[in-house]
Amino acid sequence: MKAVVQRVTRASVTVGGEQISAIGRGICVLLGISLEDTQKELEHMVRKILNLRVFEDESGKHWSKSVMDKQYEVLCVSQFTLQCVLKGNKPDFHLAMPAEQAESFYKGFLEQLRKAYRPELVKDGKFGAYMQVHIQNDGPVTIELESPAPGAAASDPKQLSKLEKQQQRKEKTRAKGPSESSKERSAPRKEDRSASSGAEGDVSSEREP
């Protein structure tokens, strides 16, 4: 799941020439749902969006307050194009969840968002419709979120088990001591003075005209 979060002074959605949704100060969230998204990703994204600190505090300190802290509004718009991959110059959307399934998932996302915050402060567009989204970005401030976050696979129990096994193999290799070839490399070599002097003679002869 991907989200583009923009801090706004106002934002609205128009469908067929009619404004269907609007907010004042707050955040506008463009949400892209992928084929692999589950309830776990949904809940993670809701927490991230609501707790993202993109606002100032009372003293003017930046990046101190979230939309919940400030009791500002949230406008959500479903945006499957965030799951785009390029084939040459042509966008391909095979990673996006199919519309029928995604609509139900998106409604669940909105429900969770409203439950975690204040229902009257969470607005949305119209799923599947051709929309004009008017965003007055404040700053501008635009943050990209992803669930799971890049690199989060390392916290997966299966992945951790693999890493532990790799570490154990390394430790066993160290415990065996140096291999024969490394012993040979580390063994002191006797100096061959004749070879050394011969090599020096070759070099000096190349330098002389």
UniProtKB/Swiss-Prot annotation:
Its EC number is 3.1.1.96. Mg(2+) binds at V4, Q6, C28. Keywords: Cytoplasm, DNA replication, DNA-binding, Hydrolase, Magnesium, Metal-binding, Nucleus, Phosphoprotein, RNA-binding, tRNA-binding. The modification Phosphoserine is found at S197, S204, S205. GO terms for biological process: DNA replication; tRNA metabolic process. It catalyses: glycyl-tRNA(Ala) + H2O = tRNA(Ala) + glycine + H(+); a D-aminoacyl-tRNA + H2O = a tRNA + a D-alpha-amino acid + H(+). InterPro entries: Daa-tRNA_deacyls_DTD (IPR003732), DTD-like_sf (IPR023509). Belongs to the DTD family. An aminoacyl-tRNA editing enzyme that deacylates mischarged D-aminoacyl-tRNAs. Also deacylates mischarged glycyl-tRNA(Ala), protecting cells against glycine mischarging by AlaRS. Acts via tRNA-based rather than protein-based catalysis; rejects L-amino acids rather than detecting D-amino acids in the active site. By recycling D-aminoacyl-tRNA to D-amino acids and free tRNA molecules, this enzyme counteracts the toxicity associated with the formation of D-aminoacyl-tRNA entities in vivo and helps enforce protein L-homochirality. This is D-aminoacyl-tRNA deacylase 1. It comes from Bos taurus. The gene is DTD1.
